[in-house]
Amino acid sequence: MLKFTLHKKDGYARRGTLELNHGKIETPVFMPVGTYGSVKAMNPQNLHDIKAQIILGNTYHLWLRPGLEVVEQFGGLHGFIGWDKPILTDSGGFQVFSLSDMRKLTEEGCTFKSPINGDKLFLSPEISMKIQTVLNSDIAMQLDECTPGEATREQAKKSLQMSLRWAERSKKAFEDLKNPNALFGIVQGAMYEDLREESLRGLEQFDFPGLAVGGLSVGEPKPEMYRMLRAVGPILPEHKPHYLMGVGTPEDLVYGVAHGIDMFDCVMPTRNARNGWLFTRFGDLKIKNAKHKLDKRPIDESCTCYACQNFSRAYLHHLHRTGEILGAQLNTIHNLHFYQVIMAEMREAVEQGKFADWQARFHENRARGTD
């Protein structure tokens, strides 16, 4: 089940509601990444506290560990991980294609060696749909060939054509399995605007309830990613949700929303948190730096997260320098809370028709820097 309602537009920025089998999501939305069924350093209550509406699980990793037979015993990923809100799963393709020296690609699918025990494994559109059906994610993704940003035109065209054939197979398998959830198609085409449009037009025949933009944030220069967003975002179908995969910084989220994107996921806020890199309204802060050793202030005096309401920069600096687990948890709570606040503010700005003003103020504040 998927029902998307578009409430308001302000330029290309959109404010909507996405209804799924495990609940309703207000868009634009950021989805914390729970690769192995766990958002690193966060428990489900932490996620509820920061107002996370939906999280992402990784099909490839959950297939390898704990394995489908385990998750199936719990009726799906929700029961296994104790999360009652929506979940989106990727197709597993990105991770498999990252194993460039351990995989073989054919029209049928991809053969690769398990990085865990060396077993020979095979992933196809049909197998990806079977895995995601067992996981019972509210949103599943088609299997696509993940095109590197530096692909030649010929490589990108050949790749997107295979992804379109796999889109058809993914949809058929999804329907044959009687999966009650939603399946998204993925727009590919590397850094070629006309190929992106060709991919989008090719997907129209399958009438997926939502569409994702894939193959960005894969090593290409930032201006190239933004160029593709400017080209693709505004031509995505208005009545469907738009998902930008694997992106990104706070600035990337704002740029994406400004160009018609509704959904985002990225490991950046959690990974950076574990490395002591904190996002704030007034720029980024590196908590490991010695200047924070005696600082009694919170990370961000305007922030209402648990970390900022209760602890000093000095304490967080100490936790990071000593490698305490609590430091990673508090940093992660703060970063994910900050991302959720940005999304909530953008939703409100679009509702009020003041997105451009909000965007200008956001960039002005972020450029100011922390002290």
Curated annotation (Swiss-Prot):
EC number: 2.4.2.29
Known function: Catalyzes the base-exchange of a guanine (G) residue with the queuine precursor 7-aminomethyl-7-deazaguanine (PreQ1) at position 34 (anticodon wobble position) in tRNAs with GU(N) anticodons (tRNA-Asp, -Asn, -His and -Tyr). Catalysis occurs through a double-displacement mechanism. The nucleophile active site attacks the C1' of nucleotide 34 to detach the guanine base from the RNA, forming a covalent enzyme-RNA intermediate. The proton acceptor active site deprotonates the incoming PreQ1, allowing a nucleophilic attack on the C1' of the ribose to form the product.
Gene Ontology MF terms: metal ion binding; tRNA-guanosine(34) queuine transglycosylase activity
Cofactor binding description: Binds 1 zinc ion per subunit.
Swiss-Prot/TrEMBL GO biological process terms: queuosine biosynthetic process; tRNA wobble guanine modification; tRNA-guanine transglycosylation
EC primary class: transferase
Record-given protein name: Queuine tRNA-ribosyltransferase
This protein's GO CC annotations: cytosol
Oligomer and partners: Homodimer. Within each dimer, one monomer is responsible for RNA recognition and catalysis, while the other monomer binds to the replacement base PreQ1.
Region RNA binding, residue ranges: 246-252, 270-274
Keywords associated with the record: Glycosyltransferase, Metal-binding, Queuosine biosynthesis, Transferase, tRNA processing, Zinc
InterPro entries in UniProt: ArchSynthase1/Queuine_TRR, TGT, TGT-like_sf, tRNA_ribo_trans-like
Family: Belongs to the queuine tRNA-ribosyltransferase family.
Residues noted as binding Zn(2+) in the record, renumbered to the chain: 303, 305, 308, 334
